[in-house]
């Protein structure tokens, strides 16, 4: 039997997803709890795998890990795990086939970026966004890793205005390092007329002198991963701690925003 966990986390509390010695990461935190509870013996022995290695500061509402449970498989339940986790929540568990791999089985991944309105020209941003849809060489919009194919396909981009900010949603099967954050900054530059759509088209064709820098990571969240025939199960009781923790973060952020908003009004 193999299990998959749907996890969410506050990326600002971790130094990224991937395990690193001596620093707090999402993967490291989760493995520590799973081994402490004897659900797994070690990540190697129990085939621990993750879907997306989010960067430092990037949050997730839907990331996935899988493993073969050991001695205390009965404790691999959201309510038990959430009692032992901090800044990280298990939102569901699923039994999956033995050959399941959370990264390779993913049909698509969706990211959301929350961008404060700086007086953007929305039509220009939308026109620029359409250029990114489809299959392209994203070398100009990524931090390239040696030997990795820079060609990726984006199936959907949307820009939704809300009160004082925009939600940029980007969906594709896989992404390069910093790709989403660099695309967001390109859209931002287009909205401020610092970058023209024609320049974006040229960059996607391989014509560029410098790359677009990445937008800050703190406003990015891995929102959803689509899998074939995988159903994550949970219940209201299991989610109660996550709801409390998220509301606390929301309340704190809202109060700070109000505080600085009043300061701006008085200047």
Curated annotation (Swiss-Prot):
InterPro entries: PsdUridine_synth_cat_dom_sf, PsdUridine_synth_TruA, PsdUridine_synth_TruA_a/b_dom, PsdUridine_synth_TruA_C, TruA/RsuA/RluB/E/F_N. The active site is at 55 (nucleophile). It catalyses: uridine(38/39/40) in tRNA = pseudouridine(38/39/40) in tRNA. Substrate binds at residue 111. It is an enzyme of class 5 (isomerase). Its EC number is 5.4.99.12. GO terms for molecular function: RNA binding; tRNA pseudouridine(38-40) synthase activity. It holds the Pfam family PseudoU_synth_1. Formation of pseudouridine at positions 38, 39 and 40 in the anticodon stem and loop of transfer RNAs. Belongs to the tRNA pseudouridine synthase TruA family. This is tRNA pseudouridine synthase A.
């Amino acid at each position: 039997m193999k299990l998959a966990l749907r996890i969410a986390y506050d990326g600002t509390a971790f130094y990224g997803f991937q395990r690193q010695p001596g620093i707090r990461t999402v993967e490291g935190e989760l493995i520590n709890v799973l081994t402490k509870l004897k659900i797994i013996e070690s990540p190697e022995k129990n085939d621990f795998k993750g879907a997306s290695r989010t960067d430092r500061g990037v949050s997730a509402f839907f990331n996935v890990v899988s493993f073969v449970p050991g001695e205390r498989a009965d404790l691999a339940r959201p309510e038990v795990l959430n009692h032992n986790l901090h800044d990280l929540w298990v939102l569901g568990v699923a039994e999956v086939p033995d050959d399941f791999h959370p990264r390779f089985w993913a049909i698509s991944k969706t990211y959301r970026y929350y961008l404060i309105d700086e007086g953007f020209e929305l039509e220009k941003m939308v026109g620029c966004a359409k250029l990114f849809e489809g299959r392209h060489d994203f070398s100009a919009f990524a931090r390239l890793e040696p030997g990795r194919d820079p060609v990726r396909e984006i199936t959907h981009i949307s820009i939704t205005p809300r009160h004082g900010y925009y939600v940029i949603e980007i969906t594709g099967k896989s992404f390069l390092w910093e790709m989403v954050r660099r695309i967001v900054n390109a859209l931002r530059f287009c909205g401020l007329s610092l970058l023209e759509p024609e320049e974006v088209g040229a960059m996607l064709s391989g014509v560029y002198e410098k790359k677009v820098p990445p937008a800050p990571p703190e406003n990015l969240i891995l929102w959803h991963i689509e899998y074939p025939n995988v159903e994550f199960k949970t219940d209201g009781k299991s989610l109660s701690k996550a709801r409390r923790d998220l509301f606390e973060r929301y309340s704190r952020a809202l109060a700070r925003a109000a505080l600085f908003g009043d300061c701006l009004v008085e200047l």
